[in-house]
């Protein structure tokens, strides 16, 4: 857990040297102490979702005394309004800008990690809390559609035991340029998380014109589906997962159409130049 008394003292003693101080995420104590010592200069980026962290009593001061609250999505803003009510500090949806690194050489990357030609991709922390039922759903999909060549590739540090199956491939940690190349060559990108405040991987994948499949039980991910005109499809149970995955797996035209929609969605809403103007 991040906790730095030295940082908090620095903010207290040097706040007059800054026009604004921007603590990111409510998960750690820095957001509380920044608001305590420099409320008039604090712009909070909460990155909150429906989790016990959001209901800490100390956050009442953060969300009512800060100069401004910059949310990532409408769903996040609605959650905060339900918790903190009419006394919440001035706020709006600001979000973040998306900038992508240049990709690594695909032939080298594919050989290094023994990646297949057709795969559904997950990028993030590899643990059961983030993946939910996606292993079971995917393997049942392969049973229903045994002729599918689709594999499941997971990129990220492993925090739980691997699920051993020939159709499931783990890369563990990869470099940023390698990650971009792996996203570029994915057939489908998935985010099965139930808790998100934005989902950078969704925006990165859309910026690279990839079709997305997401957990519709997460309000933030579902919001992206609607706002992007279905550049991402969502599932809510095993049946809808299998149905939506088959749609994507079997239709090149659908994936291309969704890719163009996603690219447009990110350029219109998550361009870094546009986001920076909102903070001025």
Predicted regions mapped to residue ranges:
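Donor nucleotide-sugar binding/catalytic pocket of nucleotide-sugar-dependent glycosyltransferases
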Residues: 41-52, 59-105, 115, 122
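Short hydrophobic beta-strand element within catalytic cores of glycosyltransferases
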Residues: 211-215
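Conserved small/polar residues in nucleotide/adenosyl-binding loops
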Residues: 279-280
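Aromatic "clamp/platform" in nucleotide-sugar-dependent glycosyltransferases that forms part
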Residues: 194
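Nucleotide-activated donor-binding/catalytic signature segment of Leloir-type glycosyltransferases, i.e.
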Residues: 156-181, 188
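Conserved acidic donor-binding segment of nucleotide-sugar-dependent glycosyltransferases
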Residues: 227-239, 247-252
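Conserved donor-binding/catalytic core segment of Leloir-type glycosyltransferases
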Residues: 70, 113-131, 135-139
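A short, well-ordered alpha-helix in the C-terminal region of glycosyltransferases
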Residues: 247, 254-268
């Amino acid at each position: 857990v991040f906790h730095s008394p030295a940082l908090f003292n620095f903010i207290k003693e040097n706040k007059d040297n800054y026009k604004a101080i921007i603590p990111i995420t409510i998960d750690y104590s820095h957001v509380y102490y920044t608001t305590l010592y420099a409320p008039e200069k604090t712009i909070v980026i909460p990155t909150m979702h429906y989790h016990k962290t959001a209901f800490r009593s100390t956050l009442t001061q953060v969300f009512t005394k800060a100069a401004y609250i910059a949310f990532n999505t409408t769903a996040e803003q609605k959650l905060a309004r339900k918790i903190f009510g009419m006394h919440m500090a001035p706020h709006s949806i600001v979000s973040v800008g998306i900038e992508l690194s240049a990709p690594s050489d695909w032939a080298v990357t594919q050989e290094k990690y023994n990646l297949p030609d057709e795969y559904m991709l997950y990028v993030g922390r590899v643990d059961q809390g983030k993946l939910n039922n996606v292993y079971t759903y995917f393997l049942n999909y392969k049973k229903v559609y045994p002729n599918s060549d689709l594999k499941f590739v997971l990129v990220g540090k492993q925090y739980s035991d691997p699920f051993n199956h020939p159709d499931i491939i783990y890369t563990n940690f990869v470099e940023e340029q390698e990650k971009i190349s792996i996203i570029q060559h994915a057939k489908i990108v998935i985010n099965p998380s139930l808790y998100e405040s934005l989902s950078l991987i969704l925006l990165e994948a859309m910026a690279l014109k990839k079709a997305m499949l997401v957990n519709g039980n997460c309000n933030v991910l579902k919001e992206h589906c609607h706002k992007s005109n279905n550049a991402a499809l969502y599932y809510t149970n095993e049946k809808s997962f299998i149905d939506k995955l088959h749609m994507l797996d079997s239709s090149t035209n659908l994936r291309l159409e969704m890719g163009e929609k996603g690219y447009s969605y990110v350029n219109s809403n998550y361009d870094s130049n546009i986001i920076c103007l909102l903070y001025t």
